[in-house]
């Protein structure tokens, strides 16, 4: 076996672990005025508290940021979060008291989120903002400092008290809302002057029950929703009588079935247009008159034009008949078409 003594001593450097442990370690923070690089001739002194620590490897952004004095330990960080939480709770309590004084606080605002979604009432912007701040602060604390929530019992105290207060407030407000709903149902049965008793849903206007004759009149209009019937009802006050019922009917008769209206549309379309000898679609006219050449018809009688004052003195039907001959003509099949 070969001896490795001389080979090991060739390095000449021996490291003592005890001496390394006794080396002076950094126990204080760098002052805020420390400069990382020399200033240029025209550069100002930096005011930012971003300083680099000696002997530490920069592995995160937090290592560049110097904490404030007295906030370096974990207990002080917990105190920061507890102070923020207390401030948030105080702000929310002030907002709720202001809303209660103004009479603007909704009973379902501070209830549980599931109750709010079931009831369908929107949250008040102020209270929802406070609750959002509380939830965001709790989420931030749980993400950044898990030992604040899961560690010592000192940090759990403010959270438990605030959560219990939140539950108590929600339960009390839910009970008040239930009582108000019960009172609203009792008061909903009202008797309007000159009318029979009817049930009024809470939060809405009461409507007078219609007579049977009026219901019979309105029955066909409900069945045929496509019919052009316009109902105009005038009401005065929260509980008033129906004054007028104006029904404007279209000139064409109303049809009870939609296919009747489609059939009438097809018939009217076929009556409006027809085809000439060349297969082109032209406007159809029911009256078929014998073909006459009316090029010299305007010079009939006294030789005046039909638009002249003398021609206007003639009888109306004859003049209209003359103008129709000037506008229309007949094709080879005898159909009346527009003159081109």
Curated annotation (Swiss-Prot):
Coarse class of the protein's main subcellular location: nucleus
Segments of this protein annotated with the region Interaction with RBBP8/CtIP: 266-340
Domain of life where this protein originates: Eukaryota
Transmembrane intervals: none
Subcellular location: Nucleus; Chromosome; Cytoplasm, Cytoskeleton, Microtubule organizing center, Centrosome; Cytoplasm, Cytoskeleton, Spindle pole
Biased composition (Basic and acidic residues): 178-190
Polar residues biased stretches: 296-313
Residue segments, region Interaction with AURKA: 175-340
GO biological process assignments: double-strand break repair via homologous recombination; negative regulation of double-strand break repair via nonhomologous end joining; spindle organization
Region (Disordered): 178-209, 293-317
InterPro entries named among the record's database cross-references: AUNIP (IPR029286)
Modified residues (Phosphoserine): 277
Listed GO MF terms: damaged DNA binding
Keywords tagged on the record: Chromosome, Cytoplasm, Cytoskeleton, DNA damage, DNA repair, DNA-binding, Nucleus, Phosphoprotein
One Gene Ontology term, aspect cellular component: nucleus
Subunit structure: Interacts (via C-terminus) with AURKA (via C-terminus). Interacts (via N-terminus) with NIN; this interaction blocks NIN phosphorylation by both AURKA and GSK3B. Identified in a complex with NIN and AURKA. Interacts with RBBP8/CtIP.
Role, per record: DNA-binding protein that accumulates at DNA double-strand breaks (DSBs) following DNA damage and promotes DNA resection and homologous recombination. Serves as a sensor of DNA damage: binds DNA with a strong preference for DNA substrates that mimic structures generated at stalled replication forks, and anchors RBBP8/CtIP to DSB sites to promote DNA end resection and ensuing homologous recombination repair. Inhibits non-homologous end joining (NHEJ). Required for the dynamic movement of AURKA at the centrosomes and spindle apparatus during the cell cycle.
Similarity annotation: Belongs to the AUNIP family.
PANTHER family: AURORA KINASE A AND NINEIN-INTERACTING PROTEIN
Stated name of the protein: Aurora kinase A- and ninein-interacting protein
Organism: Mus musculus
Gene name of this polypeptide: Aunip
């Amino acid at each position: 076996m070969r001896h490795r003594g001389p080979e090991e001593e060739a390095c000449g450097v021996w490291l003592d672990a005890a001496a390394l442990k006794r080396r002076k370690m950094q126990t204080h923070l760098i002052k805020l005025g420390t400069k990382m690089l020399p200033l240029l001739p025209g550069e100002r002194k930096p005011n930012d508290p971003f300083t680099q620590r000696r002997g530490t490897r920069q592995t995160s952004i937090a290592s560049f940021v110097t904490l404030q004095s007295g906030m370096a330990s974990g207990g002080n960080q917990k105190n920061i979060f507890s102070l923020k939480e207390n401030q948030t709770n105080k702000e929310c309590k002030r907002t709720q008291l202001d809303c209660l004084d103004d009479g603007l606080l909704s009973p379902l605002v501070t209830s549980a989120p599931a109750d709010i979604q079931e009831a369908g009432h929107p949250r008040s912007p102020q209270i929802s903002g406070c609750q959002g701040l509380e939830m965001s602060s709790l989420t931030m604390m749980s993400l950044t400092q898990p030992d604040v929530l899961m560690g010592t019992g000192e940090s759990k105290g403010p959270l438990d008290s605030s959560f219990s207060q939140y539950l108590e407030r929600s339960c009390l407000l839910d009970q008040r809302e239930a009582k108000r709903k019960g009172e609203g149902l009792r008061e909903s049965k009202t008797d309007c002057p000159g009318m029979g008793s009817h049930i009024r849903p809470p939060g809405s206007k009461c409507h007078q029950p219609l007579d049977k004759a009026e219901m019979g009149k309105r029955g066909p209009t409900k069945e045929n929703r496509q019919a052009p019937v316009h109902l105009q009802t005038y009401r005065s006050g929260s509980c008033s009588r129906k004054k007028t019922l104006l029904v404007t009917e279209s000139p064409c008769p109303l049809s009870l079935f939609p296919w009747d209206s489609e059939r009438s549309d097809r018939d009217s379309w076929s009556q409006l247009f027809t085809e000439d000898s060349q297969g082109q679609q032209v406007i159809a006219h029911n009256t078929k008159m014998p073909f006459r050449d009316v090029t010299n018809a305007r010079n009939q009688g006294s030789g005046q034009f039909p638009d002249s004052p003398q021609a206007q003195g003639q009888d109306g039907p004859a003049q209209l008949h003359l103008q129709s001959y000037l506008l229309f003509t007949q094709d080879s099949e005898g159909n009346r078409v527009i003159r081109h």
